[in-house]
Amino acid sequence: MIHDAVLDYYGRRLATCSSDRTIKIFEIEGETQRLTETLKGHDGAVWCVSWAHPKYGNILASAGYDGKVLIWREQNGAWQRIYDFSLHKASVNVVSWSPHEAGCVLACASSDGNVSVLEFKDNNSWEHSIFHAHGLGVNSVSWAPATNPGSIVSSKPSPKSTGNRRFVTGGSDNALKIWAFDAATGAYKLEREPLTGHTDWVRDVAWSPTVLQKSYIASASEDRTVRIWTSDPANPQQWNCKVLGFDAAVWRVSWSLSGNVLAASGGDNKVTLWKENLKGEWECVKSIEE
């Protein structure tokens, strides 16, 4: 079974991962695709793959049931495994690269309740931190935009700047938590009290890429709801919530590139698209069924 399929930044390469413990790389040309590489290194099903931004080279992360996060890099047509991270004690469910402005940084969410953050440094070395996030396991992670809301034009960061390193996690404790990088300690710290309201596992979280007036986070849950959390720059610690009801558990949420349309999918075999109207209410603008 194929668990994930992700195109690279330019849409020219497709990475897939499977229960057969492999990752496959395909070259995409028009309507055709050609298998160019099969990467082996995991000891169990591979749940997810994720491409880094091309400014850091052709770098791919993979994670799976074996609790490992593997980093792969292609140079001169050859793929090599350049880093193994194996401190998690259970399945790593998802990996997510930060916005490229914040560095080459990967957040990893695991069923052991921990989140790890791996950073690729200028000297080709890797640094990592790992911390406890959700008592019953972490199912999802999503980075905030590198630019704070309301500041469409920002000054160019210094070479040593870490940007706006914040992300949200969703867990089997039914909660969302927002984490922010503390440059003084070099650690990620809980930014505020957890966002609560879901009555079952949070399966997915997605932080909208918009840098307009508000921050938006969507969360999908086994409780048959999607919650859309909003925060105003004037009071960034205050998050308000709108609830969207569904007929089945909701597994995935994803924002459009502009951050104003939300796609949700789940156990009802539908993909629904949602948009905020002028009154601040969320409306289903399209439903796609199998």
Curated annotation (Swiss-Prot):
Q: How does it sit in the membrane?
A: Peripheral membrane protein
The alphabetized list of GO BP terms reads: COPII-coated vesicle budding; ERAD pathway; mRNA transport; nuclear pore localization; positive regulation of DNA-templated transcription; positive regulation of ER to Golgi vesicle-mediated transport; positive regulation of protein exit from endoplasmic reticulum; positive regulation of TORC1 signaling
- Pfam families attached to this UniProt entry: WD40
The source's domain of life comes to Eukaryota
* Gene Ontology CC, one term: endoplasmic reticulum membrane
Q: Which GO terms describe its molecular function?
A: structural molecule activity
SUPFAM superfamilies (UniProt xref): WD40 repeat-like
Q: Where in the cell is it found?
A: Cytoplasmic vesicle, COPII-coated vesicle membrane; Endoplasmic reticulum membrane; Nucleus, Nuclear pore complex
**What are the protein's UniProt keywords?**
Cytoplasmic vesicle, Endoplasmic reticulum, ER-Golgi transport, Membrane, mRNA transport, Nuclear pore complex, Nucleus, Protein transport, Repeat, Translocation, Transport, WD repeat
Q: Where are the WD repeats?
A: 1-36, 41-82, 87-128, 133-189, 197-239, 245-284
Similarity section: Belongs to the WD repeat SEC13 family.
Query: What binding partners and quaternary form does the record give?
Result: The COPII coat is composed of at least 5 proteins: the SEC23/24 complex, the SEC13/31 complex, and the protein SAR1. Component of the nuclear pore complex (NPC). NPC constitutes the exclusive means of nucleocytoplasmic transport. NPCs allow the passive diffusion of ions and small molecules and the active, nuclear transport receptor-mediated bidirectional transport of macromolecules such as proteins, RNAs, ribonucleoparticles (RNPs), and ribosomal subunits across the nuclear envelope. Due to its 8-fold rotational symmetry, all subunits are present with 8 copies or multiples thereof.
What this protein is reported to do is described as: Component of the coat protein complex II (COPII) which promotes the formation of transport vesicles from the endoplasmic reticulum (ER). The coat has two main functions, the physical deformation of the endoplasmic reticulum membrane into vesicles and the selection of cargo molecules. It also functions as a component of the nuclear pore complex (NPC). NPC components, collectively referred to as nucleoporins (NUPs), can play the role of both NPC structural components and of docking or interaction partners for transiently associated nuclear transport factors.
> Under what name is this protein listed?
Protein transport protein SEC13
